[in-house]
Amino acid sequence: AAHDAEIQIAGFGSDRLQLFPFQRAGVAYAMRQMGFTSDGDGFWHQTTPMTGGVLVGDEMGLGKTSQGLAILKATNSFPAVLVCPASLKLNWKREAEQWISGVQVKVLSGTTGNLPDADIYVINYDILTHWTDKFVSIKGLVLDESHYIKNGSAQRSKACIRMADKVSEGGVRVCLSGTPIVNQPLEIMTQLRVINRLDDFGGATSFRGTYGRASAKSLASLNRKLRSTCYVRRRKAEVLTELPPKRWAHLVVEGDPAVMKEYKKAEADIVKYL
């Protein structure tokens, strides 16, 4: 993968908040593989009609979040649905509001309710199945920690596929995971289905037949095919010189309602005791 690229995205980042060189290269790769080109002034257009998305597989800590947001903004893929683990929802909201000027982000919770107006909807995997039917059409879909859908028969995986099918023409589908394959190659199939890339591998039956057995030869072949179509991955060791010193931040984590109820009760009991 390239180590840098000259890209501009109108309304993304600021003088103090910019992508690192390898992140720019990752976004440039994604845009190229999805058929988008820049006009040079920060605006991008899909000059080659394509429906396939991308999978950003950088190691943990290399900023897949900002790359995912950059892709959404560059392609103007709003409204977008961003699916992530429950513990990361508020972090995604905060990051989106920092990176994208004027964006309206809504965090969806619970299993019922009306769909508010928003540019980005942040929702966790566990409740997605209850919300999919509320969306008629979307322009962008991002799955964070996309290995959560490694089991294609799980309800969360089926819900993600239904959401992917709601992405309109010219929209984008993006998977983010530092471990897209945890144990065996077949675990990446659902992710490829979500980003509409499974046909690049001959379809589900062909994929199983070619990569079902995790031999060194088949894994090497899969890696080459992924990188040539939809996959970019960098390791920390490869971009160490570009990384800033460690930064510490206080993150607010949304707790499970049932757990928080017990926590509040315990807190009140302690206050009463004191």
Indicate residue ranges for each PLM-predicted region.
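Walker A/P-loop NTP-binding motif
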Residues: 31-35, 63-79, 161-166, 195
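Conserved Walker A/P-loop ATP-binding site and its immediately adjacent core
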Residues: 78-98, 182-187
